[in-house]
């Protein structure tokens, strides 16, 4: 969100920020938020953006590939810093949403395939200017049911536990994707609709939490989500 007032309100409420550019980081700072609560995602980070993020002390980079991981390590070495990273795992879970906004199957370009991710962490651990801080996933956008989230977490949670035991990671980021039921929302002028069974079938934060918290709590990790 580019509105500084909105960003300031979120910052005052204790929110962190998921950013995908140096410009977004600058807006977060301009809004008075703490860069240490920013996670830098995205597949197109430039060298200057990585340098800026390291100098400002962001919480973590989400890395999408081994070449990007190596590149961040090189830039961090030049700055005599350690770059905190989380590697994005592709769990190969169908988000049951529109094909153009699905990001968690092997047909999509995002993340490291599940079967290879632990080997990537092993290699990352040997890069001296990286700090393995977490693991991340994001299976898609506009999800209107909890099932795909639950399936992905059931698959990735044991991985997160192993990574914590072996590499000391401290957080598991679930990404985002909770959808808005636009068609039904257009009917919201009718008060009767909000008391109908359709209203009760919406994916709410409470339903999301009820499905996922029991799976996540035993991990003892910090959990990040993008509402």
State what each model feature region is.
Residues 1, 20-23, 43, 64-66, ...:
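Active-site beta-loop-alpha junctions enriched in small/polar residues
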Residues 144-227:
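C-terminal active-site-proximal or functional interface alpha/beta core segments in diverse enzymes
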Residues 1-58, 97:
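N-terminal active-site wall of soluble small-molecule enzyme domains
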Residues 16, 35-39, 60, 82-88, ...:
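Structural preference for beta-strand elements that scaffold enzyme active sites
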Residues 65-131:
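Conserved anion-binding
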Residues 10-12, 29-35, 54-55, 73-82, ...:
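Acidic (Asp/Glu)-rich catalytic clusters
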Residues 28, 41, 90, 114-131, ...:
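Structured alpha-helical segments in the cores of large, soluble enzyme domains
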Residues 21, 53, 72, 87, ...:
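Conserved, mostly hydrophobic/aromatic
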